[in-house]
Amino acid sequence: MANNTISLRSLLEKEKLNGINFLDWFRNLRIVLKQERKEYVIEEAVPNDPGPNAPRADKDKFKKHMDDMLDVGCLMLATMTPELQKQHEDMVAYEMIQNLKEIYEGQA
């Protein structure tokens, strides 16, 4: 499984997001995240913290989302040009995608 992950991530690593290539980069990102079962992180807003008295299952689900969100956000930043990294470094993965879609999704 690790070899599959590495080879799929190479899709993103071969050409960093520079703005012009958003549609291709986004397609490749979705392929990688789907294989890693983390695609939900760019599709769902950050959940509310369930709090200390919440059931264990809710806490575990929240922790998994936060951990996956961190992994995906770092992957996204690592596959962007330095200028785009600076613009997005204080955002979580979901916010990055929403912002990038606003800017670039009109590309044809």
Regions found by a protein language model. Give the residues of each.
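N-terminal Lys/Arg-enriched interaction segments
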Residues: 1-108
